[in-house]
Regions:
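Short linear motifs at protein or domain termini
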Residues: 1-99, 209-215
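Short helix-capping and inter-helix turn/linker motifs at the boundaries of alpha-helical repeat units
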Residues: 8, 124, 168-171
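Regular, well-ordered alpha-helical segments
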Residues: 57, 91, 95-98, 119, ...
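Mobile beta-alpha loop/short-helix "lid" or hinge segments that flank ligand
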Residues: 57-62, 153, 169-170
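Short helix-capping/hinge motifs at transmembrane helix termini and TM-loop junctions
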Residues: 98-99, 142, 166-167
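Conserved amphipathic alpha-helical segments that form helical-bundle/coiled-coil interaction surfaces
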Residues: 103-163, 173-182, 191-202
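Short arginine-rich
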Residues: 201-210
Length: 215
């Protein structure tokens, strides 16, 4: 029982730190001091170190000799690489989902998330709706390895979406998301892929400008 409890504690610490990083509550480049986290969270250093190690595996945290663990920083090259990989995975998921998945279920789920996006009361709610909308294709693609590949980059992609949500006009890509819905309705995977690419490419300039202003 103690082992399960410990694992649960690590999960809780990991989830909290991850959420704080991807929502920018912990700024990029910030140092993660284990002793400070120990005092803040009221736990021993062991589960904190295990949680930080998991964040390192996601590359949300970087470890440097003589410095320790710190939150990642991003530049234009990083943004391009993350977007390229994420888009490749998203488009693969779309094509597989529309070939193997349940079209009616996909359309219903996407319309639900589109409605949540349109009625989001905060940028954070909008980010969650976009994340869930794209996640529909992974859930329906029928390829667990593709799903796991997405998870490996999910944290960094969510960080970029939260940065974009800090920018003016973050909600201005509703036509792209509507085009995703229409592509599913018309059984046109290439239209869906094009809409997702347009959404991602449209967000990049604002993200890069934000990074430049927060150097």
């Amino acid at each position: 029982m103690a082992r399960i409890k410990k694992a649960s504690l690590v999960d809780q610490i990991y989830s909290r730190l991850r959420e704080d990083i991807i929502t920018l509550k912990i700024p990029m480049g910030a140092r993660l001091n284990v002793n400070e986290l120990q005092s803040e969270l009221g736990v021993s250093c062991t589960p904190i170190r295990e949680a930080v190690n998991r964040l390192q595996q996601e590359e949300l945290v970087i470890y440097e000799n003589n410095v320790g663990a710190r939150v990642l920083t991003l530049d234009e090259h990083d943004v391009r690489e993350i977007h390229e990989l994420a888009l490749t995975l998203q488009q693969a998921a779309v094509r597989l989902a529309m070939k193997n998945g349940n079209a009616d279920e996909m359309l219903e789920a996407i319309e639900e998330q589109l409605d949540r996006y349109e009625n989001a009361r905060s940028p954070r709610e909008g980010v969650k709706a976009v994340h869930n909308l794209i996640g529909v294709f992974y859930h329906q693609c029928g390829n667990r390895r593709l799903d796991r590949s997405m998870v490996a980059i999910q944290g960094q992609m969510l960080l970029l979406r939260h940065i974009y949500a800090e920018c003016p006009g973050w909600s201005g890509h509703l036509p792209d998301l509507t085009a995703v819905r229409d592509g599913v309705r018309n059984q046109d995977p290439e239209a869906v892929c094009a809409a997702l690419q347009s959404y991602m490419e449209g967000s990049a300039p604002a993200i890069l400008e934000w990074l430049k202003n927060h150097e």
